[in-house]
């Protein structure tokens, strides 16, 4: 026992007294401190190691007891909930001290820990105990003490050990920041990725997939590409049904900012599937509170499931639109031919799955675009039908017989007939309660269905082939055989601008959607026709500034559409800016006069006397594709997000579908 007591006394003094003792040293120097302190886990033996097995065993037991006695207070101080204090008098009911270091603690890597455990078990029991004590001390230490420990250890490392640390740390410091960050920040990061990168991100892990597939990210992707050209990648996808885009935009934007707005009552939104045309009803975001609240940080799966809706996921919408857009790009389409008219098809329009066609055979036919079935035939005109337009409730047609007829196209009943033109009606367009009609009598007639008033717009010197109403700005565009296009003010009943440049009869005029943005980089000055010009009404008071930033009208009255397209029998298509009257671009490619024209923000479709249909990029002027098949001049075209329809004097209607 004398030997054991002496060992304990020497060890305690070596641990807690940095000054080396100069008397009472035992004969062996196992516990002698180095530089004043020596580790209690140093199991090395010196040249004076005792050969007596019993004494060696007692010393080992003493070391273990001493180690436990000195480590226990440290562990009890920093992790009292896991390690009961020894004689400290600290109440277990007292809460543990704050541990800010736990917030940044990483999750253990299972394969690495298995390998570490295997290596530990290969060591002697005493070495295992010593290493376990070191790990316990470091694990219990707060951040500041950990830094001190690490600095001391690094100071004692040799180059091979430092190399091991360097190679290990390189992998350990990699952090899964996407799942570690709040969802709204992760959404913001992912929204900067392109489509391919976003799909690859979804393959990293379940957590990444949950975030990368979220509606917040893909809604932004749809907004960036659908019905417009992306400024980053140059891709544009076909138009999506607008109601759903608007209905979910506000909710998704608030989710992206980390704020949840819960409606007082669920909102039902009717939408038409962009690929199937089937009506769908969707509930708003699920919730139980009508207040605007700050979102709490939740686990990824729980957090995203709260915001599930009955809508089709935006990623699926984007995927379908991307397939259709790719088919448009490479010309992959299926063709259906509808036969039924006995004379040339002169006008058409389609919405969803319903197609209406008008012909010189004096009839209007209603078709099911999916099945090709002729649903009904509207009869009543006594001459060829040159123009028509329909909405959900009515169809209005114009004929060479000088009449306008209003139909219930669902039943085939003719509701009313309007007369007023002195010549055949060859162009019409209505929007809201305003109807405009163009005639061979060289006039444009405006019909107001609300107050039953009518008036004429005079100014063209030849047939008026096409008209276009913009009820927002209360203006009308008209195209005429006098080779001009005119812009009319419905309030003053005056022509406020005349566009001149075509050298053939102008057959069509259409405004481009307000979302369309002309790319100035493609605007080459040499492309502008030197013959193109703009003029105003003879009255000086009706002249309008040609500055692009100048308003057309005083006050808050909206300006007319900024860009318009025209086609003429001079075989060209022209893009105009209404603010300045400039012809921005001329599209060359057709061999004969262009009779038909349709466009959206992504493409232009034209049909001509040369029996060809061409697809154009409105920004660059490039002809992307040419379709043939008709045996007569193409007299009318219609454009949708995933198809276009053509009618010809060969009595056929052809549907080019890019869905499949």
Curated annotation (Swiss-Prot):
Pathway: Protein modification; protein ubiquitination. GO terms for biological process: protein ubiquitination. Residues 1-34, 86-108, 521-553 are annotated as: Disordered. It holds the Pfam family WD40. It comes from Talaromyces marneffei (strain ATCC 18224 / CBS 334.59 / QM 7333). Residues 1-13 have a biased composition (Basic and acidic residues). Component of the SCF(sconB) E3 ubiquitin ligase complex. Keywords: Repeat, Transcription, Transcription regulation, Ubl conjugation pathway, WD repeat. Component of the SCF(sconB) E3 ubiquitin ligase complex involved in the regulation of sulfur metabolite repression, probably by mediating the inactivation or degradation of the metR transcription factor. This is Probable E3 ubiquitin ligase complex SCF subunit sconB. Residues 531-548 have a biased composition (Polar residues). PROSITE patterns: FBOX, WD_REPEATS_1, WD_REPEATS_2, WD_REPEATS_REGION. Residues 175-221 form the F-box domain. WD repeats lie at residues 340-379, 381-419, 421-457, 459-500, 542-586, 587-626, 629-660. Belongs to the WD repeat MET30/SCONB/SCON-2 family. InterPro entries: F-box-like_dom_sf, F-box_dom, G-protein_beta_WD-40_rep, Quinoprotein_ADH-like_sf, SCF_subunit_WD-repeat, WD40/YVTN_repeat-like_dom_sf, WD40_repeat_CS, WD40_rpt.
């Amino acid at each position: 026992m004398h030997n054991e007591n002496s060992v304990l006394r020497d060890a305690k003094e070596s641990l807690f007294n940095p000054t080396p003792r100069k008397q009472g040293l035992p004969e062996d120097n196992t516990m002698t401190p180095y530089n004043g302190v020596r580790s209690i886990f140093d199991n090395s033996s010196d040249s004076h190691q005792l050969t007596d097995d019993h004494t060696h065993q007692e010393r080992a037991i003493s070391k273990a007891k001493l180690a436990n006695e000195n480590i226990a207070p440290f562990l009890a101080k920093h992790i009292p909930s896991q390690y009961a204090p020894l004689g400290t008098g600290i109440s277990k009911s007292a809460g543990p001290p704050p541990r800010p270091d736990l917030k940044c603690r990483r999750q253990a890597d299972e394969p690495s820990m298995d390998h570490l455990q295997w290596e530990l078990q290969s060591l002697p029991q005493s070495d295992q105990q010593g290493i376990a004590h070191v790990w316990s001390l470091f694990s219990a230490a707060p951040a500041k003490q950990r830094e001190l420990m690490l600095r001391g250890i690094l100071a004692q490392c040799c180059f091979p050990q430092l190399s091991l640390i360097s190679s290990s740390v390189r992998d350990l410091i990699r952090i899964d920041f996407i799942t570690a960050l709040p969802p709204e920040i992760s959404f913001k990061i992912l929204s900067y990725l392109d489509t391919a990168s976003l799909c690859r991100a979804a393959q990293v892990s379940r957590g990444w997939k949950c975030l990368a597939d979220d509606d917040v990210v893909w809604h932004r992707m749809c907004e960036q590409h659908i019905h417009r050209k992306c400024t980053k990648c140059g891709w544009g996808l076909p138009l999506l049904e607008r109601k759903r885009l608007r209905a979910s935009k506000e909710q998704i934007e608030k989710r992206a900012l980390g704020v949840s707005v819960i409606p007082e009552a669920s909102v039902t939104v009717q939408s038409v599937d962009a690929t199937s045309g089937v009506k769908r009803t969707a509930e708003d975001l699920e919730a139980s509170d009508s207040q605007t609240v700050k979102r709490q940080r939740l686990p990824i799966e729980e957090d995203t499931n709260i915001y599930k809706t009955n809508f089709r996921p935006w990623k699926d919408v984007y995927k379908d639109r991307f397939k259709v857009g790719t088919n448009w790009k490479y010309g992959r389409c299926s063709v259906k031919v509808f036969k039924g008219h006995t004379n040339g098809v002169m006008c058409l329009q389609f919405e969803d799955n319903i197609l209406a066609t008008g012909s010189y055979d004096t009839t209007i036919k209603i078709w099911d675009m999916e099945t090709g079935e002729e649903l009904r035939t509207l009869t009543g005109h006594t001459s060829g039908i040159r123009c028509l337009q329909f909405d959900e409730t009515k169809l209005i047609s114009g004929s060479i017989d000088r009449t306008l007829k209003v139909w219930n196209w669902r039943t085939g009943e003719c509701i009313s007939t309007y007369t007023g033109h002195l010549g055949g009606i060859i162009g019409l367009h209505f929007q809201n309660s305003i109807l405009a009609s163009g005639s061979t009598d060289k006039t444009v007639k405006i019909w107001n269905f609300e107050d039953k008033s009518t008036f004429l717009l005079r100014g063209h010197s030849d047939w008026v082939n096409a008209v276009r109403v913009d009820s927002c700005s209360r203006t009308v565009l008209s195209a005429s055989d006098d080779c001009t296009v005119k812009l009319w003010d419905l309030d003053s009943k005056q022509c406020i601008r005349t566009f001149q440049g075509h050298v053939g009869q102008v057959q069509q005029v259409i405004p481009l959607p307000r979302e369309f943005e002309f790319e100035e980089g493609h605007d080459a000055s040499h492309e502008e026709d030197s013959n193109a010009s703009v003029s105003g009404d003879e009255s000086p008071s009706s002249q309008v500034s040609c500055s692009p930033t100048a308003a057309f009208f005083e006050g808050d009255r909206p300006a007319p559409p900024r860009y318009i397209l025209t086609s003429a029998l001079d075989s060209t298509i022209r893009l105009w800016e209404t603010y300045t009257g400039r012809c921005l671009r001329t599209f060359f490619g057709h061999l004969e006069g262009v009779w038909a024209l349709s466009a959206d923000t992504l493409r232009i479709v034209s049909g001509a006397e040369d029996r060809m249909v061409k697809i154009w990029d409105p920004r660059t002027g490039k002809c992307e594709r040419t379709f043939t098949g008709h045996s007569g001049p193409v007299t009318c075209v219609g454009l949708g997000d995933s198809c276009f329809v053509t009618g010809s004097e060969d009595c056929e209607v052809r549907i080019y579908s890019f869905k499949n």
